[in-house]
Amino acid sequence: MSWAARPPFLPQRHAAGQCGPVGVRKEMHCGVASRWRRRRPWLDPAAAAAAAVAGGEQQTPEPEPGEAGRDGMGDSGRDSRSPDSSSPNPLPQGVPPPSPPGPPLPPSTAPSLGGSGAPPPPPMPPPPLGSPFPVISSSMGSPGLPPPAPPGFSGPVSSPQINSTVSLPGGGSGPPEDVKPPVLGVRGLHCPPPPGGPGAGKRLCAICGDRSSGKHYGVYSCEGCKGFFKRTIRKDLTYSCRDNKDCTVDKRQRNRCQYCRYQKCLATGMKREAVQEERQRGKDKDGDGEGAGGAPEEMPVDRILEAELAVEQKSDQGVEGPGGTGGSGSSPNDPVTNICQAADKQLFTLVEWAKRIPHFSSLPLDDQVILLRAGWNELLIASFSHRSIDVRDGILLATGLHVHRNSAHSAGVGAIFDRVLTELVSKMRDMRMDKTELGCLRAIILFNPDAKGLSNPSEVEVLREKVYASLETYCKQKYPEQQGRFAKLLLRLPALRSIGLKCLEHLFFFKLIGDTPIDTFLMEMLEAPHQLA
């Protein structure tokens, strides 16, 4: 019998849920609706039945996001608009009945079970009747709920849906899964820097006030002042102040006056010997130099003292011998002439003194001439200045002549004469400089690595460093209570350099050496045999 020949009572059988193909489908659908009626008492059975008959064989439409959000269901396959058996006010076909608002759900910040951006999963069968909460919504959650938390979210999770029983396919229930709140990441915390970190305890340069890079040569200083002090010591540079020697030395004006900057380096406690020890340690690592402890043996101060005493005795013999210019009665009255004659006489003894200084004779002959030519004026000034310690307002020449301050002023050399008295003679008298210290200062002047024309300046510099070390050791042993004595001795070197240059102007003006070039004279003296042996 065909479906068209069915008797007209078939719809009644369908409505009663009896057998038949369409009736089977309606029977299944009505069974689902009956379960919905038991879970949703506010739905009207009459309205649901009328909607089921009117809908015929149409499939149940999928819930909209808004409806799913109000019913608390997501991708579980349940539809809040399922037709029921009856309704007092039947709606037109295809128009879903309005569902009453359900009880408000607590806000959930738990991440969704589905992947982000994935298509919605297929519908699932309804959960068991005893499930207290619906299945957690997927990534296509309702717009009424807050979006899922980002991966880096570190806030607490407080949703009762997390610990509820999750429905599994087939109507079974899985064990409850406790989702622990994520651990608070370190990026969300603000940790203050430790008190001993790199930002604490910043020191400033003791010379200019710039940021200090550490302790250099005994003082916290910046890289600029460290390099300035090292260059000054290694090259034995001398500076002069254009003002009153009280210039401001700070970060902006530290390069304005090198003299005041160098004096401030010494005043703050920078040690010249530390520069020499630093270079010596570098040579020890390379195996090219001796240790700092061996420097006094390489440049013994007793040999330097012997050289000073030998030259002094030779000068006394020349004064007392026949033909000597000693004695104030036989000397001319012009102080400039007396100084020129004494300087000419001292040039010979100066060469003999240099030959007695350790390691000087081992240098090439041309280098010996260059060193004597570069420092002969300072060497002679240092010698007669120390000889004049016991003389008041005057200097004592090697010929035994005494030149008074008034005579120098009358001859037109009073300005440079006063500088010799105040910057050299007076300072040597105050600190009671002995002959060993004088000999070491003169040896430092002699070994000048900055003299132009040297074949091996580094060798000369090594000899100067050995003199530095020997003099420092001598000061510590002879004057242990005077810790700054070594520095005071070295401070006389810039004054000697400045006064020596000024004296050269006067001496060349008065034609000290006449028509004989100084290079030829020194060469002849160096080639002569050692007469003071």
UniProtKB/Swiss-Prot annotation:
Residues 205-270 bind DNA. Expressed in aortic endothelial cells (at protein level). Expressed in monocytes. Expressed in a variety of tumor cell lines. Keywords: Cytoplasm, DNA-binding, Metal-binding, Methylation, Nucleus, Receptor, Transcription, Transcription regulation, Zinc, Zinc-finger. GO terms for biological process: cardiac muscle cell proliferation; cell differentiation; cellular response to retinoic acid; hormone-mediated signaling pathway; in utero embryonic development; maternal placenta development; mRNA transcription by RNA polymerase II; nervous system development. The modification Omega-N-methylarginine is found at residue 25. Residues 1-23, 36-181, 276-299, 313-336 are annotated as: Disordered. Residues 271-295 are annotated as: Hinge. CDD domains: NR_DBD_RXR, NR_LBD_RXR_like. Residues 46-61, 132-143 have a biased composition (Low complexity). Residues 67-82, 276-288 have a biased composition (Basic and acidic residues). GO terms for cellular component: chromatin; cytosol; nucleolus; nucleoplasm; nucleus; RNA polymerase II transcription regulator complex. Gene3D superfamilies: Erythroid Transcription Factor GATA-1, subunit A, Retinoid X Receptor. Induction: Down-regulated by aging. Residues 89-109, 118-131, 144-153 have a biased composition (Pro residues). Pfam families: Hormone_recep, zf-C4. Residues 296-529 form the NR LBD domain. It is found in: Nucleus; Cytoplasm. Homodimer (in vitro). Heterodimer with other retinoic acid receptor family members. Binds DNA preferentially as a RAR/RXR heterodimer. Interacts with NR1H3. Interacts with AKAP13. PANTHER family: NUCLEAR HORMONE RECEPTOR. Receptor for retinoic acid. Retinoic acid receptors bind as heterodimers to their target response elements in response to their ligands, all-trans or 9-cis retinoic acid, and regulate gene expression in various biological processes. The RAR/RXR heterodimers bind to the retinoic acid response elements (RARE). Composed of three domains: a modulating N-terminal domain, a DNA-binding domain and a C-terminal ligand-binding domain. Belongs to the nuclear hormone receptor family. NR2 subfamily. This is Retinoic acid receptor RXR-beta. It comes from Homo sapiens (Human). The gene is RXRB.
